[in-house]
Amino acid sequence: MKRPFKRILYGGDYNPNQWGKEIWKEDMRIFKDARINSATINVFSWAKIQPSEETYNFTELDEIIDMLSRENYDIVLATSTGALPAWMVKRYPEVARTDYEGRHHKFGQRHNACPNSPVFQKFASRLAGKLAERYGDNPHVTCWHISNEYGGECYCENCEKAFRVWLREKYQTLDELNKAWNTEFWGHTIYDWDEVVLPNALGDGIEDAAEPHMTAFAGISIDYCRFNSDGMLNNFKMEKEAIRRYDKETPITTNMMGTFKGLDYFKWAKEMDVISWDNYPAYDTPWSLVAMRHDLMRGLKDAPFMLMEQTPSQQNWQPYNSLKRPGQMRAQSYQTMAHGADTIQFFQLRRSVG
């Protein structure tokens, strides 16, 4: 594998396709003035690249990559699979997630695909492979960015079937499963693998629980979380394998989220060439907590990591977006470097149109 980076990367997510091309040239000028040397692109462009099941269109992405290559940028190229296109949900409704309440979703938002959908896996792997085939030999592509901020859950029939398979591989026998879950409690003894149901509001979920997604059986809940993490990791590995068919050397990553509990990051780290994560402290987040998260990320591989995202301004999911005081963004970035980062990147280099 190639050495991840020959220089400290300074840049961030760049989505020029949101703007007219007359803005692109100006971006290159002002980015150079700001000494920006890298851009993360194509994070949410699946619908643009693949407007229908049979059609791929790389024309605009070709232009963006050519422009950045001419300016000697390090390109972090994403696979776009963090948000699937509307046509896929319309034609294959099973790719959409079913939530904890048992509601099957329509198209919308992001992180919106069932991780155990064979249809989603097929299209995601195919797209990753096509991107690697087209751009894998570009020397300016210095890192592959698979999907985006893996997380969330699905409780559909595909997931339930996959959960049973996962449990059989783990426990081998129903006796071992019943023992591990203490199913004697409340008369929950399982006599057939098909009797296992997902731990959501339609099954063992506790109504009006103090914490969301609580269930009556901790063992079932913990195993579901492990299964869900493994399922998403399997998707990451599928895309990684598709990339490696055409690009054997460029480092591959996905952006983690610090102390996010939903995934087993220690297990994920074994499959990643370099760790990357997104740092979005709130106005009242202790700096010591941010430091601990940096150390956690560095410790996953005992090696330098990438700061894939941070922001000088706002996030659409924070209850409050406080203005950072003068020098605070610089101090936050220096703290990141001091804890072992090889990159300082932002979301976004140019704000969205709306």
Task: Please place each PLM-identified region on the residue numbering.
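Short, solvent-exposed turn/loop segments enriched in Gly/Ser/Thr/Pro and often Arg
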Residues: 15-17, 42-45, 78-87, 142-151, ...
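Hydrophobic targeting/anchoring helices
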Residues: 253-354
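Boundary/entry segment of secreted carbohydrate-active catalytic domains
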Residues: 2-23
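Conserved, mostly hydrophobic/aromatic
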Residues: 12, 31, 39, 68, ...
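Aromatic-lined substrate-binding rim segments of carbohydrate-active enzymes
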Residues: 25-105, 129-132, 236-246
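Short, well-ordered coil/turn segments that N-cap beta-strands
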Residues: 5-8, 35-37, 69-75, 137-142, ...
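Surface-exposed, active-site-proximal loop segments in enzymatic domains
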Residues: 45-59, 87-118, 157-160, 217-221, ...
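Polysaccharide-binding and catalytic clefts of secreted carbohydrate-active enzymes
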Residues: 102-274, 278-292
